Each structure stands twice: as structure tokens, then as C-alpha cells.
Amino acid sequence: MDKNLKKEIENRRTFAIISHPDAGKTTLTEKFLLYGGAINTAGSVKGKANSKYAVSDWMGIEKERGISVTSSALQFNYEGYCINILDTPGHQDFSEDTYRTLMAADSAVMVIDASKGVEAQTIKLFKVCVMRHIPIFTFINKMDLEARDPYELLEEIENVLGIKTCPINWPIGSGKRFKGVYDRDTKKISMFQAVSVGGAKSAAETTYDLEDEAFKGEVGDELYDQLMDDVELLDGASEPFDQDLVDKGELSPVFFGSALTTFGIETFLEHFLKMTESPLPRMSDIGLIDPITEPFSGFVFKIQANMNKAHHDRIAFMRVCSGKFDATKDVFHVQSGKKMKLSRPQQIMAQDRKVIDEAYAGDVIGVFDPGIFSIGDTICTPGKKFTYEGIPTFAPEHFCRLVALDSMKRKQFMKGVTQIAQEGAIQIFQDYNLEMSEIIVGVVGTLQFDVLKYRMENEYSCDVRLEPLPYGHIRWVKDPATDLNSIKCPSDTKRVKDMKGNPLILFTNEWSIRLLLERNEGIELTEFKKN
């Protein structure tokens, strides 16, 4: 076995960061990059014309609004590890792209605002992590601002998300009285010191032992006594740390800190790297594929067109699952049955692209896509032929009719909407019985409608109108051979088909779904489509 290959793969960690809007996910991502030396200063991310943009935000609409619409892949080195972060959108409306990004991660970091606790978007993303049984780490952020009781926050995580928690460190006070954290592993106290917002790494932290008189003098009797009670209670009553349960995604290690002031980031990184594993074997149609002993293979989890308007290019993001990718060698695209060289392989950080010659299991690379790749495609070494488990298509929740304002631009219109749909940010449907019918667009989050309109007008020079539709649910009919015309549908439903001709039904509410199931014995409907 190639010892260098083994070492490279064992040093890799690939994780996604999930959170609700404004919980501090982008700030945390940037502070990680600061520690790895990937960037020099962190810009606080707001939608102001004169502010710095986050390193992971690149699309025009993202710059205008100061939000992350797409999911970016960022790589940095830290303490001998090569870390790949999959950054997911954190604004109110996210896309199916966000769910798919989690299919490429080996673990997830869940960022929670200490004043708000578990919020709606966190719950949606958490469900995908649970579906995949990946480890989930919790970073409770903004402890230097007004925060809820830490016990209350842990209880909410356990009750709402159904996962056990194990605090690795514990806060001493919060808001203006936030003094630092107690590390339950090392039994040391790190005193809170704020670093300026755009500053580099945190200032040298003052550390104390629990019994130090100097520490007691600095925090005062009330906070000291509270901490002593907390330590006793945690040691006696909290869930003990169990690496096996962490690996199965049943126990979440919890950390407290403040990303904006760079407090608690280094501690979190060090514990996280010890508690996570290098890339694990992945399931395919021929069984598990070992990341170290098997030659190169990977799968496409995201496609993005026009990442650089000057290039009019289309990039396929690929997660390398096994072996070493060598840019000089041919690869085999399983779905088309073709041998090819991957053109211009690169690592992408916002607008910066670095052309690479090689990549290892765990890495995420972008490759030029001439229009042959689809989400979920498998790419492997010639001579091998298998497919990784498909990435599910998730049911959209919002629907619009898309109309081209200039009927002479029908060709441009269809090209634009089809390309954007192939990237997976939107899904398109047509009437089940009519061939050249209206285009119905379905999205997971409504901001994708704005993104679609913006991109159709700016990238495809095609003015469009979006007409909202009353539907709030869509279901695939499990048997694709079903004739929808034979199904007794309630009057407020609509029969449609997707790009692949699969039959679906649009519903206005859940009552209509129940009514259809009652009227049609034996029919099976599903919320997501396995690909």
C-alpha cells in the first residue's frame, strides 16, 4: 500500500456547517479559515454595498444582499490536517442544494445562537444528517451577548432534535458577565478576551485551574460558586462522552463560544479533529468502497453554471470518495459509459480558483462540465464500474408558473430554465397530458424564485414573469408506470410530470393528500425520489 496515499487520506476531514440564518455560521467559517492561514482578515458579512463580502459568497445576488445563496467548498490546512468545509446557505430561504451538500459531508457542525436556541432551518438540515447517520457537533455561539440558560439550550436540543448532548466545555456567565469557559476534559478555564471583529487569531488566552485563587478573584464569588455547582451537576447527571454514539450520530458534543470575537474556536477545532474520523467507506451498488485501498472514485453532488460571468462556464462539484485523483489520467463516467479527462480540475474559494493536479478521498473539487454531468453521477478509474447510492430529490414546498415575456426567445428561455434545473436549485414540471405546456417551477425556499428571475435576466438575457400557484405540497407516485389519468384526484390538485417523465401530483394542503389516498386504494406516494 502507498504509505503517502494512506497518510494523505487519514489526515482529511470533510464537514458541513449547518445553522439558521444569523446564528453566526459564516463568521465561524471565516475564523476557521483564519486559523488555517487561508485568509488574512475576516470581513463581517452584511448586505451593505461598501462592506467586505464573505469569502464564500460569490454570486451577484449574494453580493447585493450579503447572504450565501449557494453552497461553497473551502479547503485549509491546520495542525497537519487537511480540512474541507462545505458551507451551506444560512439565509431564511435555502435550496435543495443545501440538502445535497450534506450528502458529501462526513460530519456536520451545527451552529446555534445562544439567545434563540434551535430554529426552523436547523431542524430541516438536522433531519438530513440523521438520515445519513453522520456525527453532529454543536457550537453554541454568541455567549458574549445575552444568552438563554445553557441547561435550557441543551434540553431544547435533546427534545426538539431527539439527540443526546454532552457538553465538552461549559460557560461561566453570559452577555456582559461572560467570563470564559471551563474545559471538562482538561479541567482548565479559558478566560474570555474579545478580539476585534476583523482581527486574526484570538489573543493569548489566560488559563487557570479550577482551584486557582486568582481565578476566583477575577470572576467573583457568585459566578465561582455557580461554576462549582455546575461542574458537580454535569459530572453527576450529564450524558457521559461516548465516541461510538458520536460516530453513529446519536450523541452531540457541545461547545460554547463566540465566533465574532474568536473565542472558543481553537478549542473547538482541536477537540473536533480528535473526535472525527478520516473519510469512511461509502455504499455503492457493489457494496462498500474503501477510501484507501480502492483506486480513484467520486460522485457529483452539485452543478453550478456561470460561476464567472466572463467565462459562461459550468462547474460540477465532485466529492472524491476513494484513492487519489490524478489530473493527467483518464477517468470513467459511469452514466455515459465514456472514458475522459476531467477538464481544468480546481479548488474554488469564492471567485478564486486554484487549478490542481491531484486530490484525495475526502476532497471536493470543481471540474469543467461540458453539459454531460448530472447530480449523483459516479466517476471512477477506468476498468471499474459501479455507482454510488443516488442523491435523493427532495420535495419542493413552493410553486410558480414561469412565463417568458418575449415569445421569440422561447429557445433561450428553455435553455436557461433547463440548465438552472440541471444544477438542482429548482425543479421544473409540466402538465401531465400536454407536451409543450406551461413551465411550473418548484423550490425548497422562496428566495430561489428571486435567484431564478435574476439569473434568467442577467445570464440568459430572457425577461420572465413568475406567477404564484396555490400548491404547497408535491408527491411522487411511487410506481412510475402509473397512469395518472386513472387516479381519482380531488379538484384542488394538479397532475404533472418531472423532467424525466415521472408522474407527480400537486396538492394545496395535506387534507387533499389524505383524500386522494382514501379514494385510490393501494396507491403509494413519496416525499422524495431516490435517484
Name each model-derived stretch.
Residues 1-531:
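Structural and coupling elements of P-loop NTPases
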